[in-house]
């Protein structure tokens, strides 16, 4: 699969000479063209350059919040002068109000060069920039299937996670890279879930409260997950205005399949939705485009509170650069898309291709949850579910909660930065 491994630690090319600024010239009233030592050229808009200044007058040195008011920049601004310092820095002098002296901005060659690669990209995946204002550097995801986790599962011990900094870092690294991490040896007590969440950040409360229980409930109005029915691949709460980024599930009770027979069911499975989406993108690009541009309604009746929740998302979401961002997938809350009738068949064909790939056993990381297991997963990347089980044979009780994904991503970024100091 192209793009299968995007390991952030290997993103620095060795033995490649650093670029230098060779020439800067004015192309027109609003544009400077920078030529680099490898003959790369890039056009930079003057308003964009002025807005990108990071001096202490434009960006607060401690909080890194912008002090420069973007909307007050003259849309017709032109540089008064510019100079290149040793091929490494471009200095540009900008006009200000009549009562203020010109403003001087400095842009490093490395900084300009990475945007040159981004702005001039015509085909393929655009490169990431390493500017902290735009991206969590060193955060590339690693796509996976069952074979990868058979050899190296993203698992660690509860004691290591709770007591050692390296354990905490491994947990959030697994989540950022693979979208999933599994703790073993968590005490099977109801309050342990909140302790695990607090070790990383804050619980996100939902209509189910701070935490919720997943266990058999004979009430016919109950959620499907509270029955013994099979629960197919899905992401949670796609019908909310913003589906939670992270889900935690702590197993408090589970029958031993060796004692009750595996036919009793209740086996959990997890699939990398990004892997399936990337496969679709490379093998069926038109179908990928359909699933990434067609909003579909997700809706759910909270029978206990008698409230409907509705939100529309494409099954596959990409960011402004075309990179995979989110998966929203839940066949029991997805409604038929509202499309012109001549486009319906192709939509369902695209959905079928994605579903068939997701359901392949070669993509599934599956196991029987045991008391003391706790799964942490990216809820907008990892599709999860379970096989049907017989509630007369299997006493199954999971405790769950949600968190915000950016809390954990920012924690990992900080820990990496601290380790580099």
What are these regions (language model features)?
Residues 1-161:
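Motif-centric detector for short Cys/His coordination patterns
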Residues 135-180, 184-421:
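Active-site environment of non-heme Fe oxygenases that use a 2-His-1-carboxylate facial triad
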